[in-house]
Design a protein with these regions (language model features):
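Hydrophobic membrane-insertion alpha-helices, especially the h-region
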Residues: 8-26
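Short, Lys/Arg-rich N-terminal segment immediately upstream of the first membrane anchor
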Residues: 1-7
Length: 271
């Protein structure tokens, strides 16, 4: 039985047509991922060149890297996973979900796998460094900015994590930064931009909660004046919140104001 096939020369235009279609499809996907407020000038030349050369094949390579990364995580080969994460980020620098997911994975999932506080800290710091690098490439993405601030708040809070005190000490030793001030910086900064993952009112309340937790921690550490200052800032933020939202959804603002004012009376006697 005679087999019929397309002439080899006829396949060339077909291949070119398919590759062209993939290229424009990838371009559209990239545009939608980046959004209209992206800053595309924050890439190093070594990051731009691979993206240009790979063209439409970049998406395929990224998918393969994600699969490889999941495998390395399951095998607990975390340092290989870190290298893969960096490669994915270079190929998708303006896709904030990449930075958010990988930062959380390092700060929470991978850090959890280690026993010693110091090893846990290394991965918490690696995750934050990774996320902040992403913020340089996506300076107007409210979601990424908020997540960085929330990690500084949640991961370093003694009520949430056993080794939070160690993390705060190591952060100040290595960077000179205060976790609560860092958290406030990033969360407040996120309010300047659109956020798809959280409502603005939730972010505003988070600022108030950070200040309240900072006050409680300072009091616990014996820093009464600092605790008083944080409590004062928290009251100021809650009052500003009530001016913007006089209906006080959930009815929590006034309850917190009452609680913080009571704490301030206690602190006044200690200062």
């Amino acid at each position: 039985m005679k087999k019929y096939s397309l002439p080899k020369l006829a396949l060339i235009p077909l291949i070119i047509f398919i590759l062209s279609g993939l290229f424009f499809l990838q371009y559209r996907i990239d545009y939608l991922r980046r959004g209209p407020d992206s800053n595309h000038t924050n890439l190093a030349p070594l990051e731009v060149i691979p993206n240009v050369l790979l063209g439409s094949f970049r998406g395929v390579l990224v998918d393969l890297l994600w699969i490889r990364g999941i495998a390395r995580h399951e095998e607990k080969k975390f340092y290989e996973l870190l290298a893969i994460n960096n490669m994915i980020a270079k190929l998708q620098p303006h896709f904030p979900a990449v930075w958010i997911f990988q930062a959380w994975n390092m700060c929470y999932n991978i850090a959890f796998e280690w026993e010693s506080p110091e090893n846990k800290w290394r991965w918490v710091k690696a995750g934050l460094d990774f996320a902040e690098k992403g913020a340089v490439r996506n300076p107007t993405n409210g979601d990424l900015l908020f997540e960085i601030g929330y990690i500084y708040f949640h991961k370093f809070d003694s009520k949430s994590f056993k080794y939070a005190d160690h993390y705060r000490e190591r952060l100040e030793e290595e960077t000179g930064k205060n976790s609560y001030r860092q958290s406030l910086y990033w969360v407040k900064k996120s309010l300047n931009y659109n956020s798809l993952l959280r409502k603005r009112i939730v972010i505003e309340r988070t600022v108030c909660h950070i200040l309240w937790h900072a006050s409680l921690q300072a009091e616990k550490d014996g820093k009464q004046e600092e605790a008083y200052e944080y409590a004062t800032e928290s009251i100021k933020e809650w009052n500003a919140y009530l001016k913007r939202h006089p209906d006080d959804p959930g009815g929590i603002a006034r309850d917190f104001l009452e609680k913080i004012n009571e704490k301030m009376l206690e602190l006044e006697q200690k200062v």
